[in-house]
């Protein structure tokens, strides 16, 4: 059986490899995190870790792989992982950016509007961290009384010069809820590019709709399926992946006649059928669990589309550090590619194009330079 392989996000989106988010700090708000090697090696790029549900962060929660840590670890590595464990293969678009990780789910597994708003405001409390981009891939329940506070937090952070991205959600036909419903957030819906660079793309079934008069979400779409992401080391899922691939390797050896002849035996038809049946069963389990190796799975949902868009913003800021949140929004939407077979309300401006967005940022920088020369500010 051929081992599962996926193209990396930079390959699929035809990103310019010169831009990797160097010098840019991205904050990620999520359920929990773990310092994965894709963020820690060969150089530590986790600038800070915070827990918005407590007065002080608990180191044990961070350094021990926990059930609640997988989602945030995957979103962080989707944006800024360097693919260290995969030899650089499964890297994100902002593979040299620094990250600030902000936990917003309590130890009881609850996500509240109060905690999400507190997490979003972290850059305002710690301006020395230099956060330029913030991604939120979670939301409080629709019944939470503090949802207006979440939208207010987004507005405050964007006003301070930080570009906020939010996952649209995965409920087709239903509008996004805060923070994705905030006018100032760049809300990211889902794209199914079939895991290919030039696949027959379609929309991923994500939330969309009119938030209020004059405000539709999402703003654009990005890959939300076939996204490679690392598993938490030492967890049951990770151990199963190792065991399955080891077992598959042994079974494949047994399935060829040479494997039996080494023991001066000849495989009977029944023996062969039995081994091949096991191969089919193990392969089916690997596919069902979405394993693409002993360290990575492919994941889906707008939770992963949003950090991909955030990583494009980091590339744009690397190309032109003077960009404002309004300009980043303008550039992303201006360079997105509409999908004419779908209504605008489902896709916003269309699917994200990193190379074109970075070129837009570079052109803005050039235009500013030319204007300064013409005005005599530069000689």
Where are these regions (language model features)?
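Gly/Ser-rich catalytic serine loop of serine hydrolases
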Residues: 63-76, 297-311
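Active-site-proximal beta-strand/loop segments in catalytic clefts of secreted hydrolases
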Residues: 29-32, 79-82, 102-106, 136-140, ...
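C-terminal subdomain of the subtilisin-like protease fold in secreted/lumenal serine endopeptidases
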Residues: 131-135, 271-272, 276, 280-304, ...
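Sec-exported extracytoplasmic/periplasmic mature domains
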Residues: 80-84, 121-128, 155, 159, ...
